[in-house]
C-alpha cells in the first residue's frame, strides 16, 4: 500500500525522544512523497527540533511537514488520512476515532519503542481490535532482527555521520575540553537521583556531563547540591 497522506499522533512524555522519533518519521514520509501531519501535545518541545515552528499556532506547515496542536485537533478533527500512525500507544482522540469508524483509513498502525528484547518478535505485526469501535490496528515494533520492523536509516545517514564534527558540536554546547569522556544524562523523576548524584560526584576522572532538560535533571542538580553541603 502506498499512502498519499499520513497522520502521526504523538504525546510527548520523554523529553526529546518521542518528539524526535515522530519528526524523523514525518521527514521520511515526506521524502517518499507522502504528505505528513504531525499531531502533538507539546509543540514547544517539537519547536526546539523544528526551527520555524510557532508552538502557539494550532496548525502550521514547516519545511513541508504539517503540524497540529493535539487539543485543537481533538476538538475538531480532520477526516482520517490514508495512514493513521499512533505512536507509543498514545491512544487517539475520541472524536477522531469516531470519524475513523465511519470513514476508515487504509491502515491504522501503532509504532512502538525500539527494543532488542526477545519478546518484541512475538508482538511485531500483530493486529489489535478497538474495544468498542470497528477499528483494527497493526502493531509495529522496530528492532534488530528480521522478525521485527528493523531500523529506519536515511539514504544520506552515512555521509552526515562522516561529516559530523564532534568537537565543534561539544564546544557549541559550552564544553571547554571535548577530549574528556562525555556522558549524556537523561532520567525520569522517579529514578534514584540521589544515588546517581553521589555516583557522579565520586568519579575522580574529569567528565563532561550533558544534561537533558526536564524534571529528572532538575532533581539531579538538587541532589548534587544537597550532597555537597
Task: Give residue spans per PLM region.
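Positively charged, low-complexity intrinsically disordered leader regions
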Residues: 1-6, 142
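Structural motif
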Residues: 5, 82-83, 182
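A structural signal for isolated positions on well-ordered beta-strands in alpha/beta enzyme cores
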Residues: 7, 37, 109, 184, ...
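Active-site and donor-binding regions of nucleotide-sugar-utilizing enzymes
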Residues: 9-134
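Structural alpha-beta junctions
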Residues: 31-35, 102-107, 133-136, 201-213, ...
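Active-site regions of enzymes building and remodeling cell-envelope glycoconjugates
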Residues: 64-66, 137-139, 222-229
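A nucleotide-sugar donor-handling region in carbohydrate enzymes
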Residues: 112-193
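Donor-nucleotide binding loops and adjacent catalytic segments primarily
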Residues: 168, 172-229
Amino acid at each position: 500500500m502506498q499512502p498519499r497522506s499520513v497522520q502521526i499522533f504523538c504525546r510527548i512524555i520523554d523529553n526529546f525522544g518521542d518528539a524526535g522519533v515522530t519528526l524523523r518519521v514525518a521527514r521520511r514520509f515526506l521524502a517518499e512523497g507522502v504528505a505528513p501531519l504531525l499531531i502533538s501535545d507539546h509543540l514547544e518541545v517539537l519547536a526546539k527540533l523544528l526551527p520555524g515552528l510557532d508552538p502557539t499556532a494550532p496548525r502550521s506547515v514547516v519545511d513541508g511537514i504539517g503540524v497540529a496542536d493535539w487539543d485543537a485537533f481533538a476538538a475538531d478533527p480532520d477526516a482520517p488520512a490514508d495512514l493513521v500512525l499512533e505512536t507509543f500507544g498514545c491512544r487517539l482522540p475520541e472524536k477522531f476515532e469516531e470519524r475513523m469508524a465511519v470513514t476508515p483509513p487504509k491502515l491504522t498502525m501503532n509504532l512502538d519503542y525500539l527494543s532488542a528484547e526477545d519478546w518484541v518478535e512475538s508482538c511485531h505485526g500483530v493486529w489489535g481490535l478497538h474495544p468498542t469501535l470497528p477499528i483494527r490496528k497493526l502493531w509495529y515494533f522496530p528492532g534488530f532482527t528480521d522478525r521485527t520492523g528493523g531500523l529506519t536509516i536515511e539514504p544520506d545517514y552515512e555521509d552526515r555521520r562522516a561529516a559530523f564534527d564532534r568537537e565543534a558540536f561539544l564546544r557549541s554546547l559550552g564544553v571547554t575540553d571535548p577530549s574528556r569522556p562525555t556522558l549524556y544524562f537523561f532520567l525520569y523523576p522517579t529514578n534514584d537521583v540521589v544515588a546517581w548524584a553521589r555516583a557522579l560526584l565520586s568519579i575522580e576522572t574529569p567528565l563532561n556531563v550533558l544534561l537533558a532538560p526536564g524534571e529528572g535533571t532538575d532533581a539531579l542538580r538538587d541532589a548534587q547540591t544537597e550532597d555537597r553541603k
